[in-house]
Amino acid sequence: MNMYAVFTLVLCGVYGVFMVIQGLANYRKTSGSTETFYNADRGVNTFMLVCSTAVSVFSGLAFYGWPSSSYKLGAGYISGMGAFCVGLEFAVIGYRLWLLGKEYGFTTPIDFLRSRYYSEKYGVFCAILMVAMIVPYVALQLITIGDGMNVSTKGFVPYFLAVLFACAIICFHVFGGGMKAVAWMDTFNFILGVGTLWVLVVVLVVRNFDGGMVGVYEAIKNDPVSVANLGAPGATGYFTIPGIINQALTASVATIVWPHIYSRCYIAKSKKNFEVMAWGLPLGYLMTFTGLILIGIYIGPGILGSGFDKADSLVPYLATNFAPPIVSAVAMLCLFAFAISTGESMLLSGTAMVTKDLFVRHRFLLKGLPADDKKVVHWTRIVVIIMMIGMLIIVWLRPAAIVDYAYKLSSPYFAMVMPAT
């Protein structure tokens, strides 16, 4: 067994055990009330809400996609942070959703959409399509973990074994703790993910270049493609001014309309949460995406040049081949933090829609029948297991179109169901 495998297995194993214990420790606390299981009693404090929202956006695709895309397209890709637009959305839209959630007991995006358009059928339509988008997207988080661990251990850990491990810890964590456990773990994952990312950045620079960041520039200054990618429009000409504005607005709008982010607006403790979100969330994005972009436009080209043909695995490749084994394992923890936070948040959102909006509402509430809170939580936990099985099937089949389906189609659809007013 190589040292990369040893360090990765130890760190990821400890992380997984800790996560399962933390989730199951909340089992009894969340079993008696849907308000606790779905909404954490609408009592999440400001720091936790900022961390939970930010890390739920970062996903395994950010870990792979941002360095890869910026490596190919240039520094203009950082416009995808959405800048101040992201904070503005939560101050303007998120705050109003919070008020409506408190007033009418909203839990899911469907609660609001159904009420806004006065249509049960529209609610069913949106719920089905949102769940249809969520399942492959969560599966994609598992795929990134499987690929990342396989690369980080230099093939020692099989892809599907890593996927099963990630699936198990997500399932047990959501099953046991609901939103209470998810929000707490997201805070831990934000600190872990950002911290490990910057450890990787510093180690790659110190270990591979004399003179720090100046040494990195010396390595790329004679490569016209790499130099062009340090600014806009980049070597490909992709990031013109309209292109940058389009990227910024699209990314920022997509943030709040994703179901798992939408639901974050309901769990805030007070108005102050949204005042801080207005500046705290863009700051959280900046801390993370700056590190990912630096790897893509600066460190990656400095080490590998501009013609690297495995850009889609840029971060794990650099961590495994140009950093000590312990740092490679640390980078794997960063991927775990991003992918698992997004995966479990979307899983919880999807199971809430299946259970509450599709089953309980139409089987009980619309017929005037009572629905016991304990039973609803129990049914939700069953749906968690069923949905995870569905995701494993997708991961096993691994259809080639899953990235296009989950990533390119879901964001525009989620954005289109947001009401115009």
Model-flagged regions — what are they?
Residues 18-30, 94, 134-142, 146-152, ...:
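Hydrophobic alpha-helical segments and their helix-loop junctions in multi-pass secondary transporters
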Residues 13, 18, 125-140, 173, ...:
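Selective recognition of specific alpha-helical transmembrane segments in multi-pass small-molecule
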Residues 105-118, 177-188, 257-289, 311-314, ...:
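Hydrophobic, small-residue-rich membrane helices and short re-entrant helix-turn-helix hairpins
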Residues 19, 80-175, 246-251, 337-345, ...:
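Helix-loop-helix module between adjacent transmembrane segments
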Residues 116-124, 131, 160-164, 355-399:
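Loop-to-transmembrane helix boundary motifs in multi-pass membrane proteins
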Residues 1-64, 174-177, 190, 196, ...:
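Membrane-interface "cap" regions at the ends of multi-pass membrane proteins
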Residues 24-27, 60-69, 135-152, 174-180, ...:
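Transmembrane helix-loop junctions in multi-pass membrane proteins
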Residues 38-105, 243-254, 261-307, 318-342:
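Membrane-interface helix-loop-helix modules in multi-pass membrane proteins
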